[in-house]
């Protein structure tokens, strides 16, 4: 205590302490040797409200210090070792949770070399005080898995956030969406058309109106790059892309074609993320795409396709990818149907454990024309037509109309365009 009281007359910097250990060579982020803690502070809330929110969330705090001003310093355990990316991800996750509960975080404190107030030092007429140590959960891991109650008082006092969409009214941000259908019906063509629509902000299929040009991350393993290249050229020609449209595709699309790799592996009765998942997560965080596409699911899933626990965990990891995008994103995952359900269009037609389709908020199915439809519409070449239906929609009204698509022929063979079968000219 004599040492503490003895520094009262020293220069101001003595009243600070760094929240993470340094190497002795400097005091920047590059000099941090271990990412143990992050700093949480708010200059807009009362200290009583700061204390209430943090303690109610059971956040794992190594220490809580009264700054001698208008804030508390919460030194939070993040246990990120020497992994800076993990540190940044956990800080962002922590700050996001706090913001949802009304704690307006000073985000300037996010870097690991931040300083906190040294307890026992006077700041003007106020003393910097150590209020608590080791409160909340014992560790970051324990805190992350604990359920958190919703802030119902906020529900009552405020309006809910507006649901945002990647494709207006039909593909919401924050959701896992996709197509479940048997092979050969056009999943890949439709998906690539939607990708190019999203990149350009140009409506290609009338039902799917993109919310402006956006970045897209595309993992596609069923077809080689050469085939996707050919399809790209055909789609661009069929939809009369301008030089500006092509430029936007070049700027906004990052694709990894013809490569499959497991994002999960079996572990302890469930699955755990692999190094490939961490790589994809890093790409999402770096690139900030609003649409993330995996086609097909089976080529990126490492586990038992019929195990609900494992599939559910895998889908949960895909959902976590949306949280790495600051402005929100949707994940589009294509999957094959089971053999016995190939002739059906329903939300239950996907192959394997039901946890996969349960996790998807929006689903589409594909089929060919029935004999009655061929006769009713007087179709001469029914193999050119594909029926697309919105079989599931949890966050918005389900699109109830049948979406009819027609294949181009000749040099543009394979390209699908949406058609209105009530119009005679569409049937030619």
Per-region residue spans from a language model:
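Short beta-strand
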Residues: 3, 62-69, 106-111, 246
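Phosphate-binding/switch region of NTP-binding enzymes
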Residues: 178-179, 184, 188-189, 291, ...
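The Walker A/P-loop phosphate-binding site
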Residues: 146-235
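Conserved inter-motif catalytic segment of the P-loop NTP-binding fold
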Residues: 211-305, 409, 425
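Short, conserved secondary-structure transition motifs
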Residues: 75-82, 104-130, 253-265
């Amino acid at each position: 205590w004599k040492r503490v009281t003895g520094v009262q007359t020293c220069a101001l910097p003595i009243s600070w302490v760094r929240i993470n250990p340094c190497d002795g060579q400097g005091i920047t982020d590059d000099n941090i040797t271990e990412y143990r803690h992050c700093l949480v502070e708010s200059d807009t809330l009362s200290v009583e409200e700061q204390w209430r929110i943090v303690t109610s969330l059971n956040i794992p705090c190594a220490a809580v210090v009264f700054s001698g001003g208008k804030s508390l310093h919460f030194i939070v355990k993040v246990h990120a070792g020497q992994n800076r990316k993990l540190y940044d991800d956990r800080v962002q996750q922590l700050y996001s949770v706090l913001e949802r509960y009304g704690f307006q975080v000073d985000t300037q404190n996010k870097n690991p070399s931040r300083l906190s107030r040294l307890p026992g030092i006077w700041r003007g007429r106020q003393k910097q005080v150590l209020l608590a140590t080791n409160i909340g959960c014992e560790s970051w891991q324990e805190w992350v898995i604990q359920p958190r109650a919703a802030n119902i008082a906020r529900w009552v006092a405020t309006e809910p956030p507006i649901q945002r969409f990647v494709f207006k009214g039909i593909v919401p941000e924050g959701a896992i969406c996709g197509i479940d259908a048997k092979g050969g019906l056009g999943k890949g063509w439709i998906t690539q058309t939607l990708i190019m629509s999203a990149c350009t902000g140009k409506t290609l299929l009338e039902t799917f109106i993109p919310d402006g040009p956006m970045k897209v991350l595309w993992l596609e393993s069923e077809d080689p790059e050469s085939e996707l290249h050919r399809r790209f050229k055909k789609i661009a020609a069929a939809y009369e892309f301008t030089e500006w449209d092509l430029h936007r595709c070049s700027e906004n699309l990052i694709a990894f074609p013809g490569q499959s790799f497991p994002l999960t592996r079996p572990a302890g009765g469930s699955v755990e993320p692999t190094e490939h998942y961490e790589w994809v997560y890093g790409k999402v965080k770096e690139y900030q795409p609003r649409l993330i596409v995996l086609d097909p699911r089976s080529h990126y899933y490492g586990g038992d396709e019929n195990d609900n626990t494992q599939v559910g965990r895998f889908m949960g990891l895909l959902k976590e990818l949306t949280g790495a995008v600051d402005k929100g994103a949707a994940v589009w995952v294509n999957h094959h149907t089971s053999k016995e359900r190939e002739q059906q269009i329903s939300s239950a037609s996907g192959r394997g454990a039901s946890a996969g389709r349960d996790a998807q908020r929006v689903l589409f199915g594909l089929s060919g024309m029935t004999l009655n439809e061929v006769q009713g519409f007087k179709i001469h070449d029914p193999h050119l037509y594909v029926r697309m239906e919105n079989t599931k929609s949890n966050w918005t009204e389900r699109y109830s109309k049948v979406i009819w698509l027609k294949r181009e022929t000749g040099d543009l063979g394979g390209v699908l365009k949406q058609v209105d079968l009530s119009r005679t000219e569409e049937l030619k």
